[in-house]
């Protein structure tokens, strides 16, 4: 027997609640290149946070997600962002950062960047990571080559924005990850 879960999505813009039953990532309408990457990581069934957040994000809804460490929060936002950028031909033509993911520390930013790399490896979506405590020249060079998704720590983001290396006028997706730790 296949494992089934149900979820309710409430949209603040309307009074209706949708009940969706799903079983696998494929049934969440993830595109083939991303599905292949997910399967290579050994995942078949979405976690509860993924099962709720991915369909809502694919429907272009705002998400406020709270879950314990290790429950798949990163995939909950990374997969829909990658898929939207991969499928949006207009976005592909437009140079500039289209998704910004803020993380409080270098270590967490690097972890997210690795996950994005894993999920996007069969797509044309380009990403990069910036953080302080290292020479900024390689990061600036990467930015100038062009990326779609930027993972950043706040300090380095502000530094490179103030120096004119980062422009956020093309941003379509914003993720504030570990928001509680940003305030520490």
Positions of PLM-derived features:
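Short, positively charged and aromatic/hydrophobic N-terminal segments
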Residues: 10-19
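The conserved Walker
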Residues: 67-71
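Conserved nucleic-acid-binding Ia/Ib motif block in the N-terminal RecA-like helicase ATPase lobe
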Residues: 27, 33-36, 40, 92-162, ...
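Walker A/P-loop NTP-binding motif
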Residues: 54-63, 75-92, 117-118, 158
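Single conserved hydrophobic/aromatic residue that forms the stacking wall/gate
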Residues: 1-11
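Conserved pre-motif I regulatory segment
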Residues: 22-66
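Post-DEXD/H (motif II) to motif III coupling segment of the RecA-like Helicase ATP-binding lobe
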Residues: 167-168, 172-184
């Amino acid at each position: 027997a296949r494992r089934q879960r149900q979820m309710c999505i409430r949209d603040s813009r309307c009074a209706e609640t949708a009940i969706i039953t799903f079983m696998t990532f494929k049934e969440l309408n993830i595109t083939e290149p991303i599905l292949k990457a997910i399967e290579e990581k050994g995942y078949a069934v979405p976690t509860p946070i993924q099962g709720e957040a991915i369909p809502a994000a694919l429907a272009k809804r705002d998400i406020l997600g709270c879950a314990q460490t290790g429950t798949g929060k990163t995939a909950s936002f990374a997969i829909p962002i990658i898929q939207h950028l991969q499928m949006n031909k207009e976005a592909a033509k437009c140079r500039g950062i289209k998704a910004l993911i803020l993380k409080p520390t270098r270590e967490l930013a690097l972890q997210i960047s690795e996950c994005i790399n894993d999920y996007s490896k069969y797509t044309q979506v380009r990403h990069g990571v910036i953080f302080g405590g290292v020479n900024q020249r390689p990061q600036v060079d990467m930015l100038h080559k062009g990326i779609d998704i930027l993972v950043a720590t706040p300090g380095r983001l502000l530094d490179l924005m103030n120096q004119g290396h980062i422009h956020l006028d093309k941003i379509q997706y914003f993720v504030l990850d570990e928001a509680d730790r940003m305030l520490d």
